[in-house]
A protein has these predicted regions:
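Cytosolic juxtamembrane N-terminal segment immediately preceding the first transmembrane helix
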Residues: 1-33
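Extracytoplasmic gate region of multi-pass secondary transporters
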Residues: 38-39, 217-272
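Helix-breaking motifs and short loop linkers at transmembrane-helix boundaries and internal kinks
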Residues: 50, 82, 103-109, 137, ...
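Conserved MFS/SLC helix-loop-helix module at the cytosolic interface between two early adjacent transmembrane helices
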Residues: 69-107
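Paired small-residue
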Residues: 93, 97, 108-116, 310-318
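Cytoplasmic helix-loop-helix junction between adjacent transmembrane helices
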Residues: 113-150
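Helix-loop-helix hairpin linking two adjacent transmembrane segments in secondary transporters
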Residues: 147-192
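C-terminal membrane-cytosol helix-exit motif in multi-pass small-molecule transporters
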Residues: 181-200, 389-397
Length: 406
């Protein structure tokens, strides 16, 4: 069944469908909390254990590696065993990993725990996008998947505020346990709310799951999606990882640099919600490039124009709106690319491919900054993958539109 086939979608919103989308939004908030909390506790953990920044980078990379493993090896099982079972299993992995993180006694124990958490997150990201698309009416699928994605940046804002106030009081171990408890709470809610849709032989992909993505009718769209998510996450993770430091380089104080990071994440939430609403009126293949190219303009202004503190913070907010708002449109686009029988597999592979860009982006940025590259040249360099991302999304969107009109 095609993602665009009206026969595979409910005719209108149902209470059950709205509840499923709301639950997926909440789960994605927990995902966001479990990911970004490490960046907030890293300085305290480093002081307590005497961990050097490069060793701390191993912890961050462990989470990304886990996401790739979950996306490639676990998420495709959702197409064979059903969304509900795999989401519950992934939440269980995340719960074990997060709770274990609060009791670890060494860096390598923490690395192992973060791999578990990453496996769960990579799985959930793919399965939830597929589930939200299938719970929504045909004309609201892109909006539903986009709304679910908005949970992640919203969680980043709240997690930062909570960490800023409670880290000095609780310490980093208790913060990890609180995040783990929030993940555990999602298990019974998911068990009660998500429908237990049985997977029939007709629903399952014929032949190897990966082979379905490379079938003649999907190959071009799959490769374009991979280019888009890889190059998009190169830029996105560069900004997310370095925006406080980049803001300081642009002339802000350390405190205002932290505010710039918070405003970026709030902008990401606003942008993702805006993209979701716009997707009901305009094709994603046009909205995503418009957002991403606008973010390139904002990035160049941020890196090359001397501005007052309020204006600099405003531009950081605009980058969040346009960059992450545009990038998060990739997941409803991915849900539209693949038929139901291989949707979780397709999105899972896209999640995994994107993690490669997520690793390379911050590393390249750190190297360029260490070599003394100016902010203007630095942002110009990242506009190259940004334009590639926009072009790939545009072409993939055209192929989806052509299929829907066929």
């Amino acid at each position: 069944i095609s993602a665009a086939d009206p026969s595979s979608a409910p005719a209108a919103w149902s209470k059950a469908g709205l509840l499923v989308v709301a639950l997926c939004f909440a789960i994605n908030m927990v995902d966001g909390m479990d990911v970004v909390i490490m960046s907030y506790i890293a300085p305290a953990l480093g002081r307590d254990w005497g961990v050097a920044p490069d060793a701390m980078g191993v912890v961050f990379s462990a989470g990304l590696a886990g996401m790739a493993i979950g996306g490639i090896f676990i998420a495709p099982l959702a197409d064979r065993l059903g969304r509900r079972k795999i989401i519950l299993a992934a939440l269980a992995l995340m719960s074990v990993g997060m709770m274990a993180s609060g009791f670890v006694a060494s860096l390598w124990q923490l690395v192992a725990a973060r791999v578990l958490v990453g496996c769960g997150i990579g799985t959930v990201l793919a399965a939830m996008a597929a589930l939200a698309a299938e719970a929504a009416p045909q004309g609201r699928r892109d909006m539903a998947v986009g709304i679910v994605q908005a949970g992640y940046p919203l969680a980043a804002v709240f997690t930062g505020l909570i960490a800023a106030h409670m880290l000095p009081i609780w310490g980093w171990q208790k913060l990890l346990l609180v995040a783990g408890a929030a993940t555990v709470i999602m298990l019974p809610l998911t068990w009660m709310i998500l429908p237990d849709r049985r997977v029939t032989a007709d629903d399952q992909p014929a032949g190897p799951a990966f082979g379905a993505l490379m079938a003649a009718d999907l190959r071009a769209r799959t490769l374009l999606l991979w280019v888009a998510v890889f190059t998009g996450l190169m830029v996105l993770y560069f900004i997310v990882s370095w925006i406080p430091k980049l803001s300081i380089e642009a002339g802000l104080s350390e405190t205002n640099g932290i505010y710039a990071g918070a405003l970026y994440n709030f902008g990401a939430f606003v942008g993702t919600m805006s993209m979701s609403m716009l997707s009901t009126r305009f094709p994603l293949g046009r909205i995503i490039p418009a957002f991403l190219l606008s973010s390139g303009v904002a990035m160049m202004i941020f890196g090359s124009v001397s501005m007052s503190v309020p204006l600099t913070l405003l531009v950081a907010f605009v980058i969040g709106v346009t960059l992450q708002g545009g990038y998060n449109g990739m997941w409803p686009l991915a849900a539209a690319i693949y038929p139901e029988a291989c949707r979780a597999t397709g999105i899972g592979w896209a999640v995994a491919i994107g993690r490669g860009g997520a690793v390379i982006g911050p590393l390249m940025g750190g190297y360029l900054m260490a070599s003394g590259t100016s902010l203007t040249l630095l942002f110009a360099a990242y506009c190259v993958p940004l334009v590639l991302c926009a072009a790939a999304a545009f072409l993939a969107g055209r192929l989806v539109s052509a299929q829907q009109q066929a």
